[in-house]
Regions:
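Contiguous hydrophobic, core-forming segments of folded domains
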Residues: 85-145
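C-terminal motif of bacterial Sec signal peptides marking the signal peptidase cleavage site
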Residues: 15-17
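Short, hydrophobic/π-rich interface segment
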Residues: 164-216
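N-terminal low-complexity or amphipathic/hydrophobic leaders
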Residues: 46-103
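Bacterial N-terminal signal peptides that target proteins for export
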Residues: 1-7
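Bacterial signal peptide processing site
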Residues: 19-21
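Mid-length scaffold segments of soluble, non-membrane domains
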Residues: 122-177
């Protein structure tokens, strides 16, 4: 009887030990996303003011983030710990400044320090292609997550919000007043993206799993990415 109790006790310890090992092996090397505010509240409720000051984010190592500037006066991007603000200067020019002293009505950010590099197949050309490919490649991965694309584009369309001061917003059409589009051609770029199947209307649009911001290699152009024609790019996914 005593021997049976000892054997049962040992078996319990083995099971607990195995569970502990499995928990450790399943632990991800990258942190959860941080989500502040919501796109739908900006578009439909007119919540344009600051929900987060970017300089309040303390851990800037491997930091990535995207969102609009407060009161929809520009676009924001954090790329590997560097923060950029883009603003409209004319219908064909913009001003891109590197600074953390800014804020956003909604923003998504994460720290990623290790990446898995994947050569994109030549069949992946558009934003929808990227979305589908990323979804398929990460079906067993921890979600949501940040990712990036680096390489050359044949064409791209980006926009910068430029809402007139004092404008009241209660619909997407009103929110996009002053939005200015910029066409890019044959540029080397980085695209920072965030993927989720569960945050439509929060940090992705209602018809997409991804939200993307693009910055050119020379850091002279940056904005929200609307259209894309890839020449040759590599995909970077957070390394488990």
């Amino acid at each position: 009887m005593i021997n049976n109790k000892i054997i049962l006790g040992l078996l319990a310890l083995v099971v607990l030990s195995c569970n502990s090992i499995n928990k450790k092996s399943n632990k991800s090397n990258y942190n959860d996303l941080h989500i502040v505010g919501a796109m739908k509240n900006v578009m439909w409720k007119g919540e344009l003011g600051s929900s987060i000051s970017l300089d309040s984010i303390s851990d800037k190592q491997g930091l990535y983030g995207i969102g609009p500037e407060s009161y929809l006066t520009g676009e924001l991007l954090i790329n590997n710990g560097k923060s950029y603000v883009s603003r409209v200067t004319s219908d064909s020019t913009m001003f891109v400044q590197q600074k953390f002293d800014t804020s956003a009505p909604f923003f998504v950010y994460a720290n990623v320090n290790k990446w898995e590099e994947i050569e994109l197949p030549q069949s992946i050309r558009t934003i929808k292609d990227v979305e589908k490919y990323v979804d398929e490649k990460t079906i067993k991965n921890k979600r949501p997550f940040a990712f990036k694309l680096i390489g050359s584009i044949s064409k791209a369309l980006i926009h910068i919000q430029n809402l007139p001061e004092g404008t009241k917003v209660s619909s997407p059409d009103e929110a996009h007043q002053g939005q200015t589009n910029y066409f890019l051609k044959n540029e080397d770029v980085e695209v920072i993206g965030f993927f989720s199947t569960e945050h439509k209307g929060v940090f992705t649009h209602h018809d997409s799993y991804i939200h993307l911001h693009l910055i050119t290699k020379d850091e002279q152009k940056m904005g929200h990415l609307d259209e894309l024609e890839i020449n040759a790019m590599k995909l970077y996914l957070p390394k488990e």
